[in-house]
């Protein structure tokens, strides 16, 4: 694949305390209380994720869950349980459409959310974020046998770009390349089918999501990086959403994520779910939200 990029691991400065396995102590009265730590201690955690995104959050025909977000979330809650000497909790998965994420957290319908949840200033006003646990960029999905599209600029010749109703990625491309034609569909899966049938020439969203589709339908699609002036077209930092101002749980999540990088679990999750060619680049460390001020 063009522009293949070596995966860059986060956690360049993993804390010595985490590597040494120092135990994090939850509040003494967490049992019977509210919030993520209480849910883990009590043995039942409700986690929000996507049900329809291959490689990230997917409900399988046997009702099991799979995907990168699923693996990360399961690792985090089990790691927090281990740190505190608790049994691994039972996880109840809850389908979490993008538009409902903050509401589900605020209403207490989920204890945490890992669902391609990009951290941004507006969302940070409503919920706390653990992470970021990965950085991804906007990219294109095209048919494997269509050699017309090798770069972003190749779209600017009247080609048709799939746009999901209410989403912004395709419009961002249109703003830069006026020659692009947008075709709207309700879901990304509908875009994928339209692309497969030749009704559109490309679709765009986060590279992680596109690699999931490419992995699911190997040989049919390929992912094209999008750059502008030599830089990624956009940056999207994925986080784990929890109740606003739950600092203790946020710190516990970040410690679990640091361990996940240090023991190699994240690299394994990434490759298993999104394939060897997944161009996901990690930068920074969990707990570093300085990008919100950029």
UniProtKB/Swiss-Prot annotation:
Gene Ontology terms describing biological process: amino acid transport
Residues with lipid group (N-palmitoyl cysteine): 27
Name of the protein in question: Glutamate-binding protein GluB
GO CC annotations, alphabetized: extracellular region; outer membrane-bounded periplasmic space; plasma membrane
Gene: gluB
Xref: SUPFAM superfamilies: Periplasmic binding protein-like II
Compartment list: Cell membrane
Entry superkingdom: Bacteria
